[in-house]
């Protein structure tokens, strides 16, 4: 999470000091939803690298209910976009534009699978009736297992898991 604005110079410097490359999260305000936006953000990151750094940002797109297969094809064709991030709407920082109906994105997942573009998932449900400690497991049961079954060749990264259930599932 490199963020943008006033935070970008310090976050890029910190990451570039420790790593040669990093997957860059697209949950800015507004979110990074297209390849041109990702490339513009990449340019800003590169401008903020410390002198002599060869840090390379690996860009991602933010999936929304408006994402089109053509957006995925463009991302797959870009040498700088490495995946697409799924945020359930309201699940985390700047996720208001996230996905409301995950199953409606199945055509997008199909295109991602065809073009070998990884799906990076912030995996939790946002239903206030579900205990916060059960939200990853419910996401796994309701969404992740069906996605894996429907798209067996789709590369998936289940990011920043926080529960033993999620760790067991990944293992």
Outline where the language-model segments fall.
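Short helix-capping segments at alpha-helix termini
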Residues: 46-54, 149-151
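Glycine-rich loop at the start of a catalytic domain that most often binds anionic cofactors/ligands
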Residues: 35-45
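Histidine/acidic residue-rich metal-binding segments in metalloenzymes
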Residues: 67-86, 92-171
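Divalent metal-dependent hydrolysis catalytic cores, especially in the metallo-beta-lactamase
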Residues: 11-37, 52-64, 80-94, 117-127, ...
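Loop/helix-junction capping segments adjacent to catalytic residues or to phosphate/diphosphate-binding pockets
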Residues: 5-6, 31-35, 66, 164
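Di-metal (Zn2+ and/or Mg2+/Mn2+) metal-binding site signature of metallo-dependent hydrolases
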Residues: 1-11
